[in-house]
Curated annotation (Swiss-Prot):
The chain crosses the membrane at residues 230-252, 257-279. It is a multi-pass membrane protein. It is found in: Cell membrane. Residues 1-229, 280-1479 are cytoplasmic. Keywords: ATP-binding, Cell membrane, Membrane, Nucleotide-binding, Repeat, Transmembrane, Transmembrane helix, Virulence. ATP binds at residues 672-679, 1014-1021. The keyword Mitochondrion does not apply. This is Type VII secretion system protein EssC. The gene is essC. Homooligomer. Interacts with EsaE. GO terms for cellular component: plasma membrane.
Amino acid sequence: MHKLIIKYNKQLKMLNLRDGKTYTISEDERADITLKSLGEVIHLEQNNQGTWQANHTSINKVLVRKGDLDDITLQLYTEADYASFAYPSIQDTMTIGPNAYDDMVIQSLMNAIIIKDFQSIQESQYVRIVHDKNTDVYINYELQEQLTNKAYIGDHIYVEGIWLEVQADGLNVLSQNTVASSLIRLTQEMPHAQADDYNTYHRSPRIIHREPTDDIKIERPPQPIQKNNTVIWRSIIPPLVMIALTVVIFLVRPIGIYILMMIGMSSVTIVFGITTYFSEKKKYNKDVEKREKDYKDYLDNKSKEINKAIKAQRFSLNYHYPTVAEIKDIVETKAPRIYEKTSHHHDFLHYKLGIANVEKSFKLDYQEEEFNQRRDELFDDAKELYEFYTDVEQAPLINDLNHGPIAYIGARHLILEELEKMLIQLSIFHSYHDLEFLFVTREDEVETLKWARWLPHMTLRGQNIRGFVYNQRTRDQILTSIYSMIKERIQAVRERSKSNEQIIFTPQLVFVITDMSLIIDHVILEYVNQDLSEYGISLIFVEDVIESLPEHVDTIIDIKSRTEGELITKEKELVQLKFTPENIDNVDKEYIARRLANLIHVEHLKNAIPDSITFLEMYNVKEVDQLDVVNRWRQNETYKTMAVPLGVRGKDDILSLNLHEKAHGPHGLVAGTTGSGKSEIIQSYILSLAINFHPHEVAFLLIDYKGGGMANLFKDLVHLVGTITNLDGDEAMRALTSIKAELRKRQRLFGEHDVNHINQYHKLFKEGIATEPMPHLFIISDEFAELKSEQPDFMKELVSTARIGRSLGIHLILATQKPSGVVDDQIWSNSKFKLALKVQDRQDSNEILKTPDAADITLPGRAYLQVGNNEIYELFQSAWSGATYDIEGDKLEVEDKTIYMINDYGQLQAINKDLSGLEDEETKENQTELEAVIDHIESITTRLEIEEVKRPWLPPLPENVYQEDLVETDFRKLWSDDAKEVELTLGLKDVPEEQYQGPMVLQLKKAGHIALIGSPGYGRTTFLHNIIFDVARHHRPDQAHMYLFDFGTNGLMPVTDIPHVADYFTVDQEDKIAKAIRIFNDEIDRRKKILSQYRVTSISEYRKLTGETIPHVFILIDNFDAVKDSPFQEVFENMMIKMTREGLALDMQVTLTASRANAMKTPMYINMKTRIAMFLYDKSEVSNVVGQQKFAVKDVVGRALLSSDDNVSFHIGQPFKHDETKSYNDQINDEVSAMTEFYKGETPSDIPMMPDEIKYEDYRESLSLPDIVANGALPIGLDYEGVTLQKIKLTEPAMISSENPREIAHIAEIMMKEIDILNEKYAICIADSSGEFKAYRHQVANFAEEREDIKAIHQLMIEDLKQREMDGPFEKDSLYIINDFKTFIDCTYIPEDDVKKLITKGPELGLNILFVGIHKELIDAYDKQIDVARKMINQFSIGIRISDQQFFKFRFIQREPVIKENEAYMVANQAYQKIRWFK
């Protein structure tokens, strides 16, 4: 190992260099070493000889580089540069310098430094460093300004190339120069940095010292020796009596030798009797002695055997339940006994209470005689031996947490100490994978247990929180989750109860409750009052007295004092066993916990399946270039094998998945619950196939029902030929149609090349015989359970299609989170391979694998591969393609330098950073390996110019389609003199049956009139905009005229300025619409006459024949529904029926929109040849529009369905693309302006309409009104029909009538506007009895208002007429204005003949007469003069409704509007027209 010191611009850093690693030094915070203002990036790495280099320059002890602000000094230290010296033992000051008298001599130093106060370092934990002002001293890599500084144990000191480390017993030194010293050297080895796996811990095989269990039997003593109770005199007396009788007989009757014989025999009998007696007595005594000796030897041996067994038991107990002091040694030495107990061991959850006389582990058998009259001391000896070994004295007393709740009673501080001992014991011997603790305790007791926070067992990993509940917040945060966990475990047991299968829950939870008040009102109380042992939960209660304990407690422990405790009951049985608790006063509990906290328990060996492996690691490369994709594409052939790496079984043991039909394929299932890595394994497989096979050999069609997440990842992959996301019913059918179309296409190509299998076709394609690429198509559904639930018919058809498509190269991979109830027999039988990751329960595992194994998987990415009927069944770790892609040395590794504080709950809390990341100068997202590989493949595809495969699945129609993407939209290029047939590009159509998407084009001749039916807000107006601009861009304004009827919400108003638009109508413009109807009817008649005249059938034929330009007429109606109930409904509908019936041949076309089909009358609707349905709230209405359809119209703005044989679906185009710099209306205005500027020809005329107000002065110049007056006419206003000038010819008699004098006065004003011109031409005489012309009395030749004056006017008229009759016309004509004709007659009594003469002859002779009067007065008068004048005059202005006047008999006008101010009717030649007088 090497250490590198980097110095630059008063910045000092140290780096521990590890062989094989690379490091970066720069000013970037993400670098391994950050130096401010460095100005360059330095890469550190080893060359092939192991020499460390900085940017390819070797570092030989010291390397100096030029920096922006200062030299960069790199000092490399090796083990040879290391030394360690003890502090001087006598003095309290030492020096380090270049001088011979220094305690530590280093020649390279310029000045000495002084180390002081090291004798008291054990108490103070620091020494003092003294140096002069010329010496730079760094402590912990910070330059010190003071001359005296403290350096604590573990601190690093740097002085002029010398590195020092302060230790409690001395100094560690790194120096490239020789260090000479008389101080004691402590070690010569440089302390190595801990290996990456230093803290990893693996269980060793456990050594179990079993307690003796063999029975020891103490046999009863043998039966006592039976003593011969015969007395000696019984053997002697009979012979003696015989001798005595013989002597008596001899004395009475001597019998010779016979007596001798009798006496001899008797004597012998006596001798033998005496000897026999003493012989038997001696034997008896010997037998008794032997019996006693043998049995006592037996008891002695038994005693030894029992004692040995007791010692073995005591040893076993002491070994497996050591003292806490011994436990400290176990942890300190990282002994293999740590975590030795598992849930499968007999002593799982066993711990020591203290020292007591415990029951023997073996049975001592002895049967005492029930009754014996004689006392046998040997029986007493055996009984004494039996009773002596009743217990094992001073042995550990063991308790366990497996058999119901336990409780501690006594003083709380004593109980807490016992719980601490239990914590230590269980934590040392049980892994935190198997055991966790949860303490519910009082807040004031948390400090006592604070040391336990270091124990990994105190972290509840399922909740990511420390297992301490001591207040309301922690209660709510933890207990609710624990409640849910208990509930789940109870449910799991109930589900397994039918199978009689035992469940072992992991981890076991030890639930310690020292304060019931925290859970008394929590829902978890219902479970706390039960025995939860069956569910992997051990309950421990703490109370002061036994009366406070819950009734379901099985084991009770009474802690009486620190030296006395009692096990009262055990498993509900009374025990009353006293014990002595262990004293742990001198044990550092936190030290044990901290040492244990450093260990990372790895349950599986590293040379087995790795926990994770990245995609590139699986391929054993670091950079995507090393994948050698091009060669793989060139060498791999799908017809031989399709095996690609998917994961690893172990180190360097690749597992491949081969979906060749004769291997693992072609179809399969993937199952895995949320977080199992299901999507990731599919991603890795897709990526692996893409790396190994050319896009012409392998392609993917992704069905991602969850929403397109996976589809987005592969959108740039050339192998991806389609994605299906978020399917509704119609999209499902569309997808199925596309897939079936692909099958038909493949079958057609197979038939063309006389092959019947994809492998044969691929071989022909490789040989160049077949030219169209046809890759294996992998249809992959990421969540088919939901798809099957929502679209069962689609799923059924998909599986069936895949089955049919086996030989066509179709592969189906179905993935699901929960296979239970989803994988039916059809899916199972068609799936040869199964990949099972972590599933929710055993039922799911059985469903996919027919074994429960997958339910036991815990790691993401871990999976079982099953092929066929267990032909292959392997566990492996799948590759993870989501890892960050980084090329060593190419860019800086991003390091999270956030500082976290571990809070009271054991959770990480950032304390130095704004978590938003917005404060960073640059927020950059790292590229994943998947993205890097896809980018690499994309670059290869571009470089090799690989032709894309025809896509079997085209994406769903976009939600925005633009006209410019479908057809040329530059009108400058499209306008021409040649009249073209009209083609309308409506949008983008989708034809899945033909695997085609393209412009939706209608030829107007064939399409006829168009009706679009759709709900409001779904793009009806946009549809019309699209047509308007499509027509306008392809035809000049003189070739296409448009009439826009906007009966909606003024949606057509923005396009009214297009030069092609003749006029624009709204629903409230009744007069204008009525006028348009008349114009359309006239135009129809005019065009029909043309056809008849030239004997052609259509206007297009007329154009070809004559070359004349007759424009196409487009009538576009938005929201035809508004026609109903409108005042003009009948006439408008009649006109539309006529237009739709006759207009097509006349090049007059109708396009309309409506919200329902019955908005039109049946005859009109029948004439609408092209019908289009958009989204309709009433689904049945779609059928009314387009008939029976395969696909419904999606609830998408702009989506439509065209009535045709196949009912083509399309999306309506928009005239302009969205531009953030311009609004839609601005874009319209820009194009309209461009058209207007570009086009210089004639534009269509609008419908002439009467302005709301017409002032004489406004029209005086434009209409040359003075000239008209000079030519003998009075301009009075405009007519409503043509909005043309209306005038009264003064050369003809005229009559003007109105309803009231006020309007007569206004008429007088208009008539006299050009009085000066009139005076020049006429001699004006006015008879004004009512005074309306009074203002002009001084401006005319004669003016009369009085009766006599009026008579004079009458005489003047007659004389003037006579004179003209005699002399002929005068140079100056006369103009007589008779205002109030009725009064004039009454005053003058003018005869009828005079009236006739004035009307008939006056104009010929230059005498012009104008009658003015109130209409009612003229009608009500019975004067014949008025009737004569009315009948003879042909010029009238009548200021009342035609229906109300009585001058003429006209046809009654229904709903004739009231005459407004300044309005009137001009009547001439028995015809009338409505006019408005000038103001």
